[in-house]
């Protein structure tokens, strides 16, 4: 009788022609750094292990950390293609880099913006190529975040938005402007593509804005500490898409649970390693969204957050 562990190994080996001496290779192109994305990657690895895949035993996972540098994702994607990995797992602009590097190696998106609108897949139900995984609807999220910001800071009139337009689609920038206008907020979108751009933008904000919206992606995530430090020093309330910004000292965040997304990416990877084709795996969307509020940051900013808003929070940092 086969144990469950040996059965899992047998199934995975069968998918690759009984190559027991040469386990499949997963190329994990991490758009961020170990500091910004480490917990998410750990969730992926843990879920993959639960599904029967142990790194170094019946699978080999090659990690590459781009630390928010787009040029690095391009380089690493090319390396994985040359290495002939069996699956590439990535997120954000890493998905684009991987797609540009190969049309044949399966690509699993752990988190990406609107994959249909941005042309990566034909539809969520039938991706129509080598990309599948998790996709987010950022336009809707931008509107929701600004509504939350208005609930917390009713008198907000001027908004600065840090946006890396090199990786953020035009419709997402339009969504920020449109939602702001609907709420009678004047939005100033600041284009940032490097850490130096972030420093320059933050240096101009003191006294010039009522709040700061940070479009959360690998570049801003890699520089979250300097963003939060500068904003707090200038007494500027902040809103983000990742909870990690709030645990680092930011005011509020609203967005998907990325631990959950990366764990679900492992499930896509498992299916592909067992023989499924990306086009047969419909893309999925987040099911868990979290509102995180940092009361300590609110007090330092002199803000009083209503009980009504606090009751909506999934987590309140005292």
Language model feature labels by segment:
Residues 1-318:
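Short hydrophobic alpha-helices and adjacent helix-cap/hinge residues
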């Amino acid at each position: 009788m086969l144990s469950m562990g040996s059965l899992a190994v047998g199934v995975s080996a069968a998918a690759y022609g009984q190559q027991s001496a040469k386990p499949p290779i997963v190329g994990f192109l991490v758009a961020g750094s170990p500091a910004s994305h480490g917990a998410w990657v750990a969730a992926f690895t843990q879920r993959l292990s639960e599904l029967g895949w142990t790194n170094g035993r019946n699978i080999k996972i090659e990690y590459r950390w781009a630390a928010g540098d787009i040029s690095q994702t391009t380089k690493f994607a090319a390396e994985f293609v040359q290495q002939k990995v069996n699956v590439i797992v990535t997120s954000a602009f890493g998905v684009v880099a991987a797609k540009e590097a190969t049309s044949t190696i399966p690509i699993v998106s752990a988190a990406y913006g609107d994959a249909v609108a941005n042309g990566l897949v034909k539809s969520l139900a039938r991706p129509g190529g080598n990309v599948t995984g998790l996709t987010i609807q950022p336009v809707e999220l931008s509107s929701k975040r600004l509504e939350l910001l208005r609930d917390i800071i009713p008198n907000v009139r001027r908004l600065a938005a840090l946006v890396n337009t090199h990786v953020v689609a035009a419709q997402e920038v339009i969504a920020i402007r449109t939602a702001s206008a609907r709420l009678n907020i004047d939005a100033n979108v600041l284009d940032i593509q490097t850490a130096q751009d972030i420093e320059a933008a933050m240096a101009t904000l003191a006294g010039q804005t009522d709040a700061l919206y940070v479009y959360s992606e690998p570049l801003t995530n890699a520089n979250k500490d300097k963003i939060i430090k500068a904003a707090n020093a200038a007494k500027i309330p902040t809103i983000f898409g990742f909870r990690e910004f709030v645990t680092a000292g930011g005011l509020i965040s609203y967005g998907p649970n990325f631990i959950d997304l990366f764990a679900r990416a492992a499930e896509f990877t498992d299916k592909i390693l067992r023989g499924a084709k990306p086009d047969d795996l419909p893309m999925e969307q987040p099911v868990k969204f979290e509102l995180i509020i940092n009361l300590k940051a609110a007090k330092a900013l002199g803000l009083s957050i209503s009980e009504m808003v606090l009751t909506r929070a999934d987590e309140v940092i005292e």
